[in-house]
Amino acid sequence: MLGSERAVVEEWLSEFKALPDTQITSYAATLHRKKALVPALYKVIQDSNNELLEPVCHQLFELYRSSEVRLKRFTLQFLPELIWVYLRLTVSRDRQSNGCIEALLLGIYNLEIADKDGNNKVLSFTIPSLSKPSIYHEPSTIGSMALTEGALCQHDLIRVVYSDLHPQRETFTAQNRFEVLSFLMLCYNSAIVYMPASSYQSLCRMGSRVCVSGFPRQHEKQWKELCGRIVLDPEFMVQLLTGVYYAMYNGQWDLGQEVLDDIIYRAQLELFSQPLLVANAMKNSLPFDAPDSSQEGQKVLKVEVTPTVPRISRTAITTASIRRHRWRREGAEGLNGGEESLNMNDADEGFSSGASLSSQPHGTKPPSSSQRGSLRKVATGRSAKDKETALAIKSNESPRDSVVGKQFVQQQADLSIDSVELTPMKKHLSLPAGQVVPKTNSLSLIRTASASSSKSFDYVNGGQASTSIGVGTEGVTNLAATNANRYSTISLQEDRLGHAGEGKELLSPGAPLTKQSRSPSFNMQLISQV
């Protein structure tokens, strides 16, 4: 220790002793201006054989027991260095040199656990909300809470837990040593935002040394001070990590990362679960680069939450979400399928859905289940709409109108029956050699890949159906419906749709057939067999 540093410490000791009580506040406001005092006090504390160590410890205790908060914080900044010297001397069994530091630590502990009246303090801790990020979780991974009455009641609810009562201690023992030291570190962390940079450096050095002393990793360090293995407590290491985490983001990035690795190293050797959990969470949440420390006196902890695994989708994949996705897809395909079905009906009217399916070529792929479902939905919607229209007409019409309506429907059905014709796909029908046109009764229609009607049926008005087929030179085939009338199911439905509403134009027998008024027809290729 240099003579100048010794002189600074002696001046500080004598100055406070002669200070009256009325000037304590002004003295506390100017104490931080003495730049040479703090480094000199660190050197006195580190040297256990220095004769100024005992008066310095006594002076620090007097500052801490004063009513001025800034004087308490001045003493707290040396707490990490005092703990390191105490543990080092405890391992070396130098009880004589350790007495004054032990008394100072016990004095601070006993002052903090009791209030002004001498009653034990009950410390309260507020549980943080999970909606805010931390080193353990991201709020995005938590599902949104339902807006219920119970959730609204707990919106402003603050959860507070209380600590147990801490008994007073007169001496250090192996059983209560880390109970006292952990509580002292808790007091230090509660005021860490007011500590200078020198205190953060002392905290990081203390954490690294107590973790690797006596282990092979000690030889990798720059400091060569020999020390035995120091017994540690998991709770003390967690409090140490709390202070180190703040120091890392406030100017001690390199030292903080070094002590973090040393704490993980010691926790793995000791199999301490709590320090491992906190230290690994801290390490996985660190940014790649050091935080911006350009602003002096910032004193703000910047928490950069970086997940260890790639981010997953915020919406959980559940059975309900898959079902909703399938419904949306089927709805979109249903709209497309509805447009395609309308186009198909315009080009090839008179076909039923079953007929169009059965008339596809063998090389084409049948429609999917979703398309069949969409066509089924369109047909169901049409039938439901037809029923509603028919009920509305039936409720509005009088008995006389109902009779006229029945006659109109019967007349229109006869018209549609008479207007059905079959036009061949080819203009020429070729018959095999040596065969003649068979009789009408023995003629059979073979369904081919071009078009067919599997949903058609025969409607016979009395007697046996007789069909006459004529094959001309131009290949035009007409089906004369005399006693038998052949028409498809879709033809009946479209006739019903076309004439169910009011104000529709009646199809007169002599009027020419247009695209809107003609009866639906379909193409069919005829192949005769014997």
Swiss-Prot record:
Domain of life of the organism encoding this protein: Eukaryota
Phosphoserine modification, residue list: 321, 341, 430, 442, 444, 491
Pfam families linked to this entry: Hyccin (PF09790)
Disordered as annotated region, ranges: 328-404, 502-530
InterPro entries tied to this protein: Hyccin (IPR018619)
Phosphothreonine PTM positions: 30, 306
Signal peptide: none
Cystines in this chain: none
Residue ranges, compositional bias (Polar residues): 353-373, 514-530
Keywords for this protein: Cell membrane, Cytoplasm, Membrane, Phosphoprotein
Location in the cell: Cytoplasm, Cytosol; Cell membrane
Tissue: Expressed in the central nervous system. Expressed at much lower level in oligodendrocytes than in neurons.
GO cellular component: cytosol; plasma membrane
The protein's role, per its UniProt record: Component of a complex required to localize phosphatidylinositol 4-kinase (PI4K) to the plasma membrane.
Family, per entry: Belongs to the Hyccin family.
Subunit structure: Component of a phosphatidylinositol 4-kinase (PI4K) complex, composed of PI4KA, EFR3 (EFR3A or EFR3B), TTC7 (TTC7A or TTC7B) and HYCC (HYCC1 or HYCC2).
UniProt protein name: Hyccin 2
Protein source organism: Mus musculus
Gene (UniProt): Hycc2
